[in-house]
A protein has these predicted regions:
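Catalytic-core regions built around general acid/base machinery
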Residues: 61-71, 198-209
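Active-site neighborhood of phospho(di)ester-bond hydrolases with catalytic His/Asp-centered motifs
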Residues: 16-18, 44-49, 73-81, 107-109, ...
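Active-site environment of divalent metal-dependent phosphoester hydrolases
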Residues: 21-25, 51-56, 80-88, 113-115, ...
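Binuclear metal-dependent phosphoesterase catalytic core
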Residues: 8, 115-117, 208, 221-266
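Core catalytic region of metal-dependent phosphoesterases/phosphodiesterases
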Residues: 2, 7-10, 17, 24-116
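A conditional alpha-helix N-cap/helix-loop micro-motif detector
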Residues: 27, 57-58, 144-145, 195-199
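Conserved catalytic scaffold of divalent metal-dependent phosphoesterases
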Residues: 67, 77-192
């Protein structure tokens, strides 16, 4: 197993992609669109619910389309809907290390720090499943999904970061995320929402301690952004097949430009 204690990448611009949920059909549309938009980009930062299980056959679409798009690496900040039954054991074998699961895909530990174009990047994967009541423990739900107190402490101990990547939303989230949480359109049970709120508070504490200029997350299945009074920005990416699932991040300015859905599907 190939591992890495960190990365130091020269890329001036990278792709950032939200939830994918193992959707091979979306991959074979999205990655060619990325190449059409800008064939010079080499890195994808994926924000969790990646959903492709590289311990099983049939996960070739990511490597296949990434190579054709000129993508050399996909760095995954893990989400809640992942194959934790395989991932946890692998992480325990190489604690604190990113490990490679395919030609281009790396799964990042929690937390993990690396650099892109001199920027300090902090990745902290994990989140709560508000649909836990409709899932089966050990089959499609795993307690390992949660961000722990130790993970929070380790993330904070590393000091400030320029860019924070999480799957879970912070408590201080984009208006679109706040509206979703207020309305609870899927009528998730109160106990699940309480765990979710605790996880968001944990992420917020990490953000407030590390003071990233930009915090990007997935999980909420809605695109939106928030520019805080302290000039820190939070961006929520939508899920596969929806607008705002992917875009280009400029490391010099930390400006994010989403790839339009009509450009992806053209």
């Amino acid at each position: 197993m190939e591992t890495a204690a960190s990365f130091d990448l020269p890329d001036e611009r990278v792709w950032v992609v939200g939830d994918l949920h193992g959707n091979a059909g979306w991959i074979q549309v999205l990655l060619p669109a990325m190449r059409r938009h800008d064939p010079s980009l080499r890195t994808i930062l994926q924000l969790g619910d990646y959903g492709f299980d590289h311990a099983q056959p049939g996960t070739g679409p990511v490597d296949y389309w990434a190579k054709r798009a000129g993508i050399e690496r996909v760095l995954v900040t893990l989400g809640n809907h992942e194959e934790w039954n395989h991932i946890t054991a692998a992480q325990e074998h190489v604690p604190g290390m990113a490990f490679r699961v395919s030609d281009v895909v790396w799964l990042l530990p929690r937390p993990f720090r690396f650099k892109i174009a001199g920027r300090e990047v902090l990745s902290l994967g994990g989140a709560s499943s508000v649909d836990k009541a409709f899932r089966t423990a050990g089959k499609d739900w795993f307690e390992d999904e949660l961000i722990t107190e130790q993970m929070e402490a380790d993330a904070v101990a590393g000091g400030p970061a320029d860019l924070l990547l999480t799957h879970e939303s912070p408590a201080s989230a984009a208006p679109e995320v706040q509206l979703l949480l207020t309305n609870n359109p899927h009528e998730f049970p109160p106990e699940a929402l309480a765990v979710s709120a605790a996880q968001r508070a944990r992420v917020q504490r990490v953000s407030d301690a590390t003071l990233p200029h930009l915090h990007m997350h997935g999980h909420m299945h809605v695109y939106g952004d928030l520019e805080r009074e302290d000039r820190r920005t939070v961006v929520s990416l939508d899920r596969d097949t929806f607008p705002g699932n992917a875009g280009v991040l400029d490391l010099a300015t930390l400006a994010f430009n989403p790839l339009a859905l009509n450009e992806i599907r053209s």
